[in-house]
Amino acid sequence: MASAAANNSSSAAYDAAETGGLLRRRNTTAAARGNAGEEEEEAEAVAPSVEQAFADKPVPSWREQLTVRAFVVGFLLSIMFNIIVMKLSLTTGVIPSLNVSASLLGFFLVRLWTAAIERVGFLKQPFTRQENTVIQTCVVSAYGVAFSGGFGSYLFGMSETIAKQATEANDPMNIKNPHLGWIIGFMFLVSFVGLFALVPMRKVMIVDYKLTYPSGTATAYLINGFHTPEGADLAKKQVRTLGKYFSISFLWAFFQWFYTAGDNCGFSSFPTFGLEAFKNRFYFDFSPTYVGVGMICPYIVNVSLLIGGIISWGIMWPLISKKKGSWYPETLPESSLLGLQAYKVFITIAVILGDGLYNFVKVFGYTIKGFIVMYKNKNSNTLPISDNGTPANATEEESFDDKRRNELFLKDQIPKTVAIGGYVVLAVITSGCLPLIIPQLKWYYILIAYIFAPIMAFCNAYGSGLTDWSLATTYGKLAIFVFGAWAGASHGGVLVGLAACGVMMNIVGTASDLMQDFKTGYMTLASPRSMFVSQVIGTAMGCVIAPCVFWLFYKSFNIGASDGAYPAPYTIMYRNMAILGVNGLSSLPKYCLTLCYIAFVAAFIINLIKDLVPERVAKYIPIPMAAAIPFYLGPYFAIDMFMGSVILYFWEWRNKDEAQSFGPAVASGLMCGDGLWALPQAVLSLVNVNPPLCMKFLSRAANAKVDTFLGN
């Protein structure tokens, strides 16, 4: 989200590897617009042309757009956003779009840079929207590696920590423990191939098909707005707001740390609704991060999360736990995947797969429909247009904006020999080198994946252009089942499936994200060459930064413990999907498979109903993917996010324009401050500096026992 996926896109809400992928894409358009609000509509109503407003400003060459300051700023922001995305991936997997924050902070830091240089008389090059787009692309592609790298899903799912939580395939053949060296190598091998997969198709997708790529378009409107006098003034106010809430969030996280000397200590374990509710994970944990995430995510996502938490932890799990001794053995520990934990994990997987299958069929259907329209009209000068595939006359007169954008977009060609040659060379290198890192992943598995990947990448990019949904994680899960079953359990099939997931997910997701970035560049007159180079440099940054950030978390915290601060929930789910593909379902407890079938079908049908009913009704129907996330984790973070929605709702009710302009800045500040505290917290942990206090809450009876014990 992700590769640059985390980046562009109504998923980029949220499975750090899964729901992050799909739901984030469902959310980003609204989030990426951020302060723009209804800017697209306003632009059409107020100004006849965006590009005429910039007509007196020369467009720098593609080399001039690639400045040192852009990549210095990009590097600094990449570190910050990698920390934030990594923390989100390893806690709940709910990752919102950070496009607004990246664009806003990139704009602010370079403006600060240019103002300082200008004062001493050394300013040689003004800050342009093209350079802003380069920064945006670099940052998003860098922190996208924290998502597509699978640190909260397939990659850490290979580890012994997660394998011990599963009941099968936990032998050495199916385990690969993380180490910084091989992780960086793995990232470099799998992250770049997708950049070359669809480069030859950029003219077809952007100019000929006129695909909208809503997230890319929204980001372009945002950047164009920053570089008008009015937009620059608003951006300064937004940055001040972001800085204010960043400071509040960071200081609050620092204050909380003093009270977390043991397990279940501190404000994050505050039994807001009572101790019984706390046992079922119903509480508000005072996390600024998830209040901020809730302010960015659409209302329906946050409501879906809360509904999912109530259905699972309020109804289903308490009822199933009463069947202990009947449906599963009484003696099993709570974390055993032969007991209650199996219902939590596999019913969640069933909902994710049901939702994913439906959206795969839906987006694939849109893609086929677009091709049919194009074929029918190939001799009548019409082309399918983005939103609904309806034909638009190709001979109708182009607007000034379209002429200007087409001219510059087609000016700096990326040679097809470079794109095709790059893909082939990288595919060969990866096929030869990946087995050195993961011997179970044979070279011919990788080669087969790379042969079919461009077709899947094209379908995904086309569907993403139509609907703003990237199904990269769905293609990744498909690879888990196909390659895991091919290899078999005795030949490391679980490890093969997880690694193949990474290969496929990176190619398909990165190709789609690059098209989103090309769309942003198209609308800001940034050269495709500068966009491509920025994406390559940003990805290279991410391949180093993301593993280093993960390693810091891995060495500092107990990652993967289901009851810890960093449970990495999707790691166990991805590993169990791989086990499912290799071994089947024979070991599941009683009625677990039946409930999984029901959950799978329910997710499919709810999505179908949501698309069939009128929009005024559909907007109130929960999203199954979002509802599934708290099935495993509990509803505590959903309560935080719902609070974010409540804050934003009342703000919009009081002053809608102000809320639309400053809501994303407040949310970004809350997320960035709390997220960035993880860095000094990790450093303190590494040097054995521990919190001095433990704040815990006990029932009256438990407190009396403690007093009696201490009194003796």
From Swiss-Prot:
Protein name: Probable metal-nicotianamine transporter YSL11
GO molecular function annotations of the record: oligopeptide transmembrane transporter activity
Location(s), subcellular: Membrane
Transmembrane segments: 70-90, 93-113, 138-158, 180-200, 242-262, 300-320, 345-365, 418-438, 446-466, 478-498, 532-552, 593-613, 631-651, 666-686
General function of this protein: May be involved in the transport of nicotianamine-chelated metals.
GO cellular component, as recorded: membrane
Organism listed in the record: Oryza sativa subsp. japonica (Rice)
Matching InterPro entries: OPT (IPR004813), YSL-like (IPR045035)
NCBIfam families per the UniProt record, alphabetical: OPT_sfam
